[in-house]
Amino acid sequence: VSSHWDSEALYFDFSCTFDELSVDERLGPAGPTARLWEYDVVELFLRPRGCSGYYEIDVGPLGQWLDLFVFEPRAHLDWSWRSRLSVDVQLDRDSRHWAVHLRLPFEAMATRFPALKMPEIGDVWRLNLFRIAGVHPGRRYFAWRPTFTTEPDFHVPSAFGNLVFLSEDCFAA
């Protein structure tokens, strides 16, 4: 995963290899898709400074995605929030690789969290990055900051790491 930012948005690039994809082409073409975490997916959980909840963005290898705001994991979710996410996905089945480039505008985040302040150099937000890969029973779960739960569960905000805005276009994590 690589990332950067500018005055308008956050950008994340994921590069994923696979042995066997878990996708459901019946879910439709690229675009908003419910329950995407049941298939191969990359996930971004982001909590800006001062925000009590966090944003969740999931993207699959077919370009399907979902966005929501989590007030409290599994208890209080806002499915109506719209991220205005821009997603570009490349899937190469022959080389067993897929890649995601996503753009998340600050303006859209502010519609759910009006107190959002545009990041400045030195600001720290909370973040975790995930990947779910493969088919059952060999399904695998990857986390930048592992949650150490008995059953796979990424909704553990205390496990989020720090995303430090170092300079225009540069983060430290």
Residue ranges and their predicted role:
Residues 1-173:
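Structural preference for beta-rich elements and adjacent junctions enriched in aromatics
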